[in-house]
């Protein structure tokens, strides 16, 4: 799940329009038993009822069968179940999208890739007239450390955009430690 969240964090902070394919917001899997690309075209898993809530049609009339076994079975992975869980991928995605919408620098701002010595960490800045967002992504399964040149913003506060808590004060050569597959969205204020 950490890799899925990391990938979606990158999707929402890199330049361009983020595209979420149906089912990605709940971690819906593929039916690898189906030929060609049909494995990714299974019915949306809305709830744990008949046909996963996708259709009232007879099961045989569906374009593709619902995923009914394994890790991605509709009884386990569906919208209704995740709506009840505040820590679910669906609710996390909703918060991620809402946070992105609240910060014009994400998606509309000027993008600047930072180049730390540690290439396991992908750091970049998104800047607009309204705000500056420092996005950090640890692409490694290990704890990673790096130093970033943030002298331009020395003395300003770093605010975690999800928790709204102060992360720290910017120093010219900021030392950052990220847990495996961790990501941070930090506003520079």
Regions flagged by a language model, labelled:
Residues 169-189:
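C-terminal beta-strand-rich structural cap/linker in extracellular carbohydrate-active enzymes
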């Amino acid at each position: 799940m950490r890799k899925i969240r990391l990938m979606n964090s990158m999707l929402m902070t890199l330049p361009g329009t983020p595209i979420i394919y149906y089912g990605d917001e709940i971690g819906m899997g593929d039916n690898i038993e189906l030929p060609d690309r049909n494995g990714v075209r299974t019915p949306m898993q809305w709830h744990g009822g008949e046909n996963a809530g996708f259709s009232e049609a007879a099961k045989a009339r569906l374009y593709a069968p619902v995923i009914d076994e394994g890790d991605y079975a509709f009884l386990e992975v569906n919208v209704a179940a995740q709506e009840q869980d505040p820590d679910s991928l669906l609710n996390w995605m909703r918060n991620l999208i809402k946070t992105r919408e609240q910060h014009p620098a994400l998606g509309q701002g000027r993008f600047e890739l930072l180049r730390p010595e540690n290439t396991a960490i992908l750091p970049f800045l998104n800047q607009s007239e309204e705000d500056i967002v420092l996005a950090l992504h640890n692409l490694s399964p290990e704890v990673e450390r790096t130093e970033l040149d943030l002298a331009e913003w020395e003395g300003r506060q770093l605010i975690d955009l999800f928790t709204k808590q102060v992360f720290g004060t910017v120093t010219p050569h900021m030392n950052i430690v990220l847990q495996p597959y961790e990501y941070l969205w930090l506003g520079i204020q």
